[in-house]
Amino acid sequence: ALMQLQARGFVEVRTRKGWYVVEPSIDEARDAFAARRAVEAGMLRDSSLLRDAGKPLQAVIKRLRQHIKDEQAAIAGTDIATRTFLLADFHVCLAECLGHRVLCGLLRDLTARTTLVASLYQSTHDARASCADHARIVSALAEQDVESAAQQMLVHIGDVESALGKSAAAVDPRERLRASLAPLVR
């Protein structure tokens, strides 16, 4: 499993030191966000996916709305890992609901790359904003307005990228380490 993660660029092995999770640079995160914008907006604009998903649209909307409820519960709680996972998994769930299995795998990789950055820098406020964006995207899909859904997705990904960039610039690396270890020190 670690070899597969290494091949995908998520972990690295250091001789005589062990395995480490790769911390993507801001430039690598920007590349992943650019790819996500192209893929996700294109996926939403392909309205044939809504017609050919093999599921009634209402079932798709119901599943996506349940996912958003799960996101809201995680945001209200204290489990940052679950919150971060669910916010990223919305995009994979969306591709899955629209019947696009190939994009599910691609989005898992892309969201994993951006999730690494988000877990370092995303605030609870940013998480709430992302969840609200997801709800707006689903509302546009419920109205069968794929162009609006695609535009909402572009704005959402841009907002997340922008917020992470500002947070990354404002956080001292030592302070970030201190904050991440704070739950362990009592």
Identify the meaning behind each predicted range.
Residues D46, C93, C97, A163:
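Short alpha-helical functional segments enriched in proximate histidine and acidic residues
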Residues S123-R186:
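C-terminal regulatory/effector modules of DNA-binding transcriptional regulators
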